[in-house]
């Protein structure tokens, strides 16, 4: 018995007890580590759907005996385990004497209290055999069943699951009825207009009503689909003409803001368009062409948008470059004066911008500054009952810090200023203060302070410096008509001007006191400001090619008959009422070619267009359009480009010849006069001599014989030269040659000078070529 016992050990009940103690790992002698805290079931907004899909058992870290946190997926050693990872209390192993049958050893320790076993979690979203599919028009319902909720946690339970499901899935418990929840991946801050979208012509005056009101009629999105700018109320994308791929424009897509109603949205957008359209005939204003309907596409949602001139960059992007500090001061002064000329043009036309900042100043490829974004602009004139007109005072927080003056910052609700300090203010002086802060930022390459209020320490320092300069150096600094030097290098915000007169202009514009602040009239009367030379003249023609409009909208066809009754030609059919280029350069003003003109349809066709279209017509419309519309070939595009280049070269040659033949100084005039006196015998009538023996006229005849220009151009050149010489000979010998009429200037010019070739510019800034220039950074 003893040998048999040694070969086959007897497994008594005491041995089973010893084995069970071994499994427990000396729990009697060493205290076990505290169990891991059960994770809370409530999910925060910071969690993503990836966090939610994990089960509670695999996501809970297992506490170890030695207190070291282990990896959730790693299995601890048997001796180190103090509690089963499944959370089920281990069943005590009984002695074999107490087991009635062998099946007692096959009990599953993973079953729950109800005696059922939870199904294993799966990663797919489809329903299992035990689940019922719930219909969802946006896809399969990803909400788990009650069985899965017991395993994954109460965050998937039926009570309150709508607030925890990720925004990417559409749940039946989600009470959000805003369609933008599905159009913008759950971002319900961007709201869409309800259908149908209103016709823009219903909100526009008769003189600027449009024939085409749909974006897709004549424009298409750029293939790169880049958002070149975005804000709280709009986003800007690039669109191209459907007829000339090289004609690129900017689409400013307008969005609804806050709790704005559709009616308020339409009025706000139409007001901005009317103001921008009214100011589009100036070289320092970004041209705005059309107000169109924008359809829902993969790029953007439905709404309204502006077709605008596309700028190269804005002034803020220019100043944030690392090499901006190396740009010469005279170029910075040039850019500042261009911005000031744009602001003055707005004020002269009765409009206050009210949101001037470097981000709202665009630059063309030629280096011309252009104001943009008239979203909060307004007409500042107010007509009283007695017929007098005065400036309309504003109230409320308007503009962007730090470009908003102190009198505006008092209206900021976050600052909690007393109501006694909140007084109405002049919107024109708001623009002047913003212009002064832009000038200081332009020179110092830093924003002087964050907010123009006494709660900002930098502004308090600037205000103290302002008062100290007046108290100790220039007591008459704020007096009107005083042009003494301004602050010098001892003041931080005047140090980099390196010119006391320039710092005077900047500080007078940015005067914290609106009563003594520079106005636009004071600025343009300042001697230093008048001496600043710019590379562009304010009277130069705006060189912007207007888009071609060849396709009309069904809503705008009735306007074709009304267009003939208006004395002002519509700018939508290729005529430029602003003095700029036509959509087709071959068209004279007030005429339309057969390519761009809109034929007046018959009344029967108009009635048919207003009938609802069937689904068959909608499906067949692309095939009908492809069969009737000829494709635009490369030969036609090349021919159009050659014709345009030939016309440009012809006009440029005429301007160059005219510039060479006109005397540019009094010395040339005397030389021409001496030659006339030597070749004529009649000394009584000087005008007759100049007419009969003018060598310039002979030169013009030779040019005509060689065929370089037309005879009419030569005759006009000769007549102008004769008149100039007659006046110079009969008058003083040092009399300057009068400048040409701005209305007769040529609209063709090079990239370095936007003026005409016949008039020499004061200064030419080659922004694209000068080393260290702003455009070479």
Swiss-Prot record:
Q: Where is the composition biased (Polar residues)?
A: 50-61, 83-133, 575-592, 648-672, 744-756
Protein EC: 2.7.11.1
Q: What PROSITE patterns does its record include? A: PROTEIN_KINASE_ATP (PS00107), PROTEIN_KINASE_DOM (PS50011), PROTEIN_KINASE_ST (PS00108)
Task: Mention any Pfam family matching this sequence.
Answer: Pkinase
The catalytic activity, as recorded, is:
L-seryl-[protein] + ATP = O-phospho-L-seryl-[protein] + ADP + H(+); L-threonyl-[protein] + ATP = O-phospho-L-threonyl-[protein] + ADP + H(+)
In this chain, the stretch annotated as Disordered covers 21-174, 564-705, 728-764
Q: Which InterPro entries match?
A: Kinase-like_dom_sf (IPR011009), Prot_kinase_dom (IPR000719), Protein_kinase_ATP_BS (IPR017441), Ser/Thr_kinase_AS (IPR008271)
Q: Which residues form the active site?
A: 355 (proton acceptor)
Q: Where is the composition biased (Low complexity)?
A: 30-41, 149-172, 677-694
Q: Which domain of life is it from?
A: Eukaryota
In which residues is ATP bound? Answer: 228-236, 252
- GO MF, one annotated term: ATP binding
Domain called Protein kinase: residue spans? 222-529
Q: Does the keyword Nucleotide-binding apply?
A: yes
Cite the PANTHER family for this sequence: OVARIAN-SPECIFIC SERINE/THREONINE-PROTEIN KINASE LOK-RELATED, SERINE_THREONINE-PROTEIN KINASE CHK2
Family that this chain belongs to: Belongs to the protein kinase superfamily. Ser/Thr protein kinase family.
Please give the name of this protein.
Answer: Serine/threonine-protein kinase PTK2
Q: What is the lineage of its organism?
A: Eukaryota, Fungi, Dikarya, Ascomycota, Saccharomycotina
**Encoding gene per record:** PTK2
């Amino acid at each position: 018995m003893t040998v048999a016992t040694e070969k086959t050990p007897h497994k008594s009940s005491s041995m089973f007890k010893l084995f069970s103690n071994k499994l427990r790992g000396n729990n009697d002698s060493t205290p076990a580590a505290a169990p891991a805290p059960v994770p809370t079931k409530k999910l925060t907004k910071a969690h993503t759907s990836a966090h939610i899909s994990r089960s509670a058992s695999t996501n809970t870290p297992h506490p170890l005996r030695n207190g070291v946190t282990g990896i959730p997926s790693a299995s601890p050693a048997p001796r180190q385990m103090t509690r089963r990872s499944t959370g089920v209390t281990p069943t005590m192993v009984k002695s074999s004497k107490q087991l009635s049958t062998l099946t007692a050893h096959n009990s599953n320790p993973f079953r729950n209290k109800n005696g059922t076993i939870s199904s294993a979690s799966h990663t797919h979203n489809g329903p299992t055999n035990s689940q019922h599919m719930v219909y969802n028009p946006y896809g399969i319902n990803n909400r788990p069943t009650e069985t899965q909720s017991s395993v994954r946690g109460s965050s998937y339970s039926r009570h309150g699951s709508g607030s925890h499901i990720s925004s990417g899935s559409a749940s039946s418990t989600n009470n959000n009825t805003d369609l933008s929840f599905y159009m913008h991946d759950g971002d319900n801050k961007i709201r869409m207009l309800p259908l149908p979208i209103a016709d823009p012509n219903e909100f526009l005056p008769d003189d600027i009503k449009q024939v085409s009101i749909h974006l897709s009629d004549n424009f298409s999105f750029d293939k790169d689909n880049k958002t070149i700018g975005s804000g709280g109320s709009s986003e800007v994308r690039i669109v191209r003409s459907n007829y000339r791929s090289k004609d690129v424009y900017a689409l400013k897509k307008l969005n609804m803001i806050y709790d704005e109603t559709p009616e308020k949205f339409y009025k706000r957008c139409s007001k901005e368009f009317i103001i921008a359209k009214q100011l589009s005939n100036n070289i320092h204003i970004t041209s705005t062409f059309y107000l169109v309907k924008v359809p829902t596409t993969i790029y953007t949602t439905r709404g309204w948008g502006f077709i605008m001139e596309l700028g190269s960059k804005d002034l803020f992007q220019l100043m944030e470059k690392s090499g901006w500090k190396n740009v010469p001061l005279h170029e910075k002064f040039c850019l500042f004066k261009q911005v000031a000329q744009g602001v003055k043009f707005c004020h002269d036309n009765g409009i206050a911008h009210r949101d001037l900042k470097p981000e709202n100043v665009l630059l063309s490829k030629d280096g011309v500054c252009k104001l943009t974004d008239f979203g909060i602009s307004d007409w500042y004139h107010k007509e009283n009952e007695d017929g007098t007109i005065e400036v309309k005072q504003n109230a409320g927080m308007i503009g962007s810090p730090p470009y908003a003056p102190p009198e505006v910052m008092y209206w900021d609700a976050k600052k909690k200023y007393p109501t006694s300090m909140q007084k109405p203010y002049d919107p024109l002086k708001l623009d002047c203060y913003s212009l002064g802060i832009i000038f200081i930022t332009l020179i110092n390459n830093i924003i002087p302070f964050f907010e123009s209020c006494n709660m900002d320490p930098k502004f308090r320092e600037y205000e103290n410096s302002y008062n100290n300069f007046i108290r100790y150096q220039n007591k008459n600094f704020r007096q009107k008509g005083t042009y003494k030097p301004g602050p010098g290098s001892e003041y931080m915000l005047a140090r980099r001007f390196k010119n006391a007169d320039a710092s005077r202009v900047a500080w007078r514009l940015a005067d914290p006191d609106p009563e003594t602040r520079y106005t636009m009239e004071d600025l343009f009367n300042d001697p230093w400001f008048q001496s600043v030379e710019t590379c562009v003249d304010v009277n130069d023609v705006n060189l912007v090619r207007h888009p071609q409009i060849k396709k009309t909208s069904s809503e705008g066809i009735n306007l074709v008959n009304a267009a003939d009754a208006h004395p002002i030609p519509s700018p939508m059919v290729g005529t430029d009422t602003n003095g700029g280029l036509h959509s087709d350069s071959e068209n004279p003003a007030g005429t339309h070619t057969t390519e761009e003109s809109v034929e007046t349809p018959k009344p029967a066709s108009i009635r048919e267009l207003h009938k609802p279209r069937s689904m068959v017509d909608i499906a067949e419309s692309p095939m009908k359009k492809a069969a009737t519309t000829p494709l635009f070939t490369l030969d036609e595009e090349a021919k159009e480009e050659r014709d345009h280049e030939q016309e440009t070269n012809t006009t440029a040659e005429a301007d160059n010849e005219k510039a060479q033949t006109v005397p540019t100084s009094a010395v040339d005039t005397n030389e021409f006069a001496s030659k006339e006196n030597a070749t004529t015998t009649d000394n009584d009538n000087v005008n007759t001599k100049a007419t009969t023996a003018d060598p310039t006229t002979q030169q013009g005849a030779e040019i005509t014989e060689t065929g370089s220009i037309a005879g009419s151009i030569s005759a006009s050149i000769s007549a102008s030269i004769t008149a100039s010489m007659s006046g110079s000979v009969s008058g003083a010998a040092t009399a300057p040659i009068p400048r040409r009429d701005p209305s007769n200037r040529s609209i063709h010019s090079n990239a370095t000078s936007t003026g005409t070739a016949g008039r020499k510019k004061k200064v030419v800034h080659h922004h694209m070529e000068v080393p260290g220039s702003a455009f070479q950074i």
